[in-house]
């Protein structure tokens, strides 16, 4: 925990979030704040709401109720950008979203790495990395290219610059996806089960990259089934089940001495 930046303002803050699909309540009164430099691992059984939580925080889905704020902005209350506010200021009230400009600002503050890579299949590794900084951020091409080449080296992809995704291994594709997300200089990186589509050997490649990013104080929120990663790399672990946060706390506490019976039951399935 010594790594954590002691700034008061969270990078992202979610309050009393609610989300349902039809009659199925997927998120039920979820509140979560993540500080600069913090690594948060979200664990739990399939169908517990983990991926929906990430999709709502990254604006791929809209909350039904509650609020979502991103920090680090020059305007707004306490330097936060209100992406969604609860109607009437009531906790858990209907989520009222900002306009397109607000959502566009928020999207530039985070990167998202999917479990299935989601690289553009017709683009080379370099073009995949450079596309969003050039098109969305309108940055200088020479600067973007320098950054992309540095990220290729950092991700261990030297020699793959001109390859398209089908010419890469799964681990290489996921590392290219991480490089693409980093190219936008995000304040926080989201990972949705980044190793679930990989075999064990390639999983190790990607986890090594995540450990490196954590050591560099990269703010990360990681939905994962990799319990060793949650224990050894995360600062905080959140255990979700049934659309609620059952338990959260320091990684070593939740993983090695969980308080709730449901957490203990879940983790026992991963013990040797």
Where are these regions (language model features)?
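ABC family nucleotide-binding domain
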Residues: 7-251
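C-terminal boundary and immediately downstream tail of ABC-type ATPase nucleotide-binding domains
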Residues: 242, 248, 252-272
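A short, compositionally biased domain-edge/stem linker segment
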Residues: 1-4
């Amino acid at each position: 925990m010594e790594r954590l930046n002691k700034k008061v303002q969270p990078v992202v803050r979610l309050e009393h979030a609610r989300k349902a699909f039809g009659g199925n309540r997927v998120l039920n009164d979820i509140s979560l704040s993540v500080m600069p430099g913090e690594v948060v691992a979200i664990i739990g059984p399939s169908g517990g709401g983990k991926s929906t939580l990430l999709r709502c925080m990254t604006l791929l889905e809209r909350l039904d109720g509650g609020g979502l704020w991103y920090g680090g902005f020059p305007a707004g209350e306490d330097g936060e950008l209100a992406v969604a506010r609860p109607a009437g200021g009531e906790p858990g009230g209907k989520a009222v979203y900002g306009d397109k400009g607000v959502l566009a600002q928020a999207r530039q503050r985070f990167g998202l790495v999917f479990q299935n890579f989601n690289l553009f299949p017709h683009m080379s590794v370099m073009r995949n990395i450079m596309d969003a900084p050039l098109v969305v951020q309108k940055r200088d091409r020479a600067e973007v290219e320098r950054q992309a080449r540095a990220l290729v080296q950092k991700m261990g992809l030297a020699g793959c610059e001109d390859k398209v995704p089908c010419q890469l291994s799964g681990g290489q594709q996921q590392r290219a996806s991480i490089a693409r997300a980093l190219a936008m200089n995000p304040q926080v990186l989201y990972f949705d089960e980044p190793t679930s589509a990989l075999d064990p050997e390639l999983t190790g490649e990607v986890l090594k990259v995540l450990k490196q990013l954590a050591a560099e104080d990269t703010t990360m929120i990681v939905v994962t089934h990799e319990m060793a990663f949650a224990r050894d790399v995360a600062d905080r672990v959140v255990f979700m089940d049934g659309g609620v946060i059952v338990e959260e706390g320091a990684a070593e506490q939740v993983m090695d001495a969980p308080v709730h019976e449901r957490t203990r039951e879940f983790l026992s399935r991963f013990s040797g």
